[in-house]
From Swiss-Prot:
Biased composition (Basic and acidic residues): 171-187
Region (Disordered), start-end ranges: 35-112, 166-204
Low complexity composition-biased segments: 35-50
Descriptive protein name: Female-specific protein 800
Length: 238
């Protein structure tokens, strides 16, 4: 019962911190959202695609056509005009800085690779906060693919416990390594236990059930100049 109460306290605290975080972002980051790619201004229904001097779609189309016609001959002038009088705001949602595209604001559609979500139960992401294509959650944060600095929730705790258990499991190769490291008679030059038999009793390396001490046998069988087992008569004739 004590662990159940502790679990409930974790869940309540996670939800409480989530509400605080979401309210903080909603109240203090509106200026960040206004430059988002999908944001639409409320003032005179001016969209994010419109320039400052154009107030209707027809004027916008004519402005774009005129700009293209006037600058067809000179690519440098065309790029200069597009940068100077862009159909988007200069501070739009994807700003080029240091040859990298930085996404500002939030985007519920494709193009946002940020990891933080507003919810503890983020069914649109995996347990690390990485979004799926069908996610419609509002997201914030850096674009490294993992949820960071958000809050401690029960799912992360359970996941860490499971990961720790998996690390404690011994793989097959590790078991073989432990077997080799044990003080077995096959890894020793002699054995004090008379009743213990070698694993490979017919091996020419062993004499009387134990490793031979008369010759300096090696284990480098791949090198013919350092072969440990003498060739038989038939093999030497070949």
């Amino acid at each position: 019962m004590k662990y159940i109460h502790i679990l409930l306290v974790f869940i309540i605290l996670s939800l409480f911190i989530t509400v605080i975080k979401s309210n903080y972002y909603d109240n203090n980051n509106q200026n960040q959202n206004q430059y988002s790619y999908h944001h639409t201004y409320n003032n005179n229904n001016q969209g994010n695609y419109q320039s400052k001097n154009v107030h209707s779609e027809s004027e916008q189309n004519s402005y774009n056509k005129e700009t293209r016609n006037n600058n067809d001959d000179d690519d440098d002038d065309e790029n200069f005009e597009r940068n100077k009088k862009s159909i988007r705001s200069r501070y739009h949602g994807y700003t080029y800085r240091n040859d990298q595209i930085q996404s500002r604001g939030n985007s519920a559609k494709g193009g946002s690779y940020s990891e933080s979500t507003y919810f503890t139960l983020h069914s649109g992401t995996d347990r690390y906060g990485r979004r799926n294509d069908y996610s419609r959650f509002q997201t914030r944060g850096r674009s490294n693919g993992y949820r960071e600095n958000m809050f401690l929730n029960v799912f992360d705790v359970v996941g860490n416990i499971k990961t720790t258990r998996n690390k404690r499991k011994i793989t097959k190769s590790e078991k073989n390594g432990r077997y080799i490291k044990k003080d077995h008679m096959n890894n020793r030059d002699s054995n004090t236990n008379i009743n213990e038999k070698p694993e490979y009793s017919k091996s020419p390396v062993f004499q009387g059930g134990y490793r031979s001490l008369e010759k300096n046998f090696t284990t480098n069988y791949g090198n013919s100049s350092n072969a440990s087992i003498p060739l038989s008569g038939k093999q030497s004739q070949l």
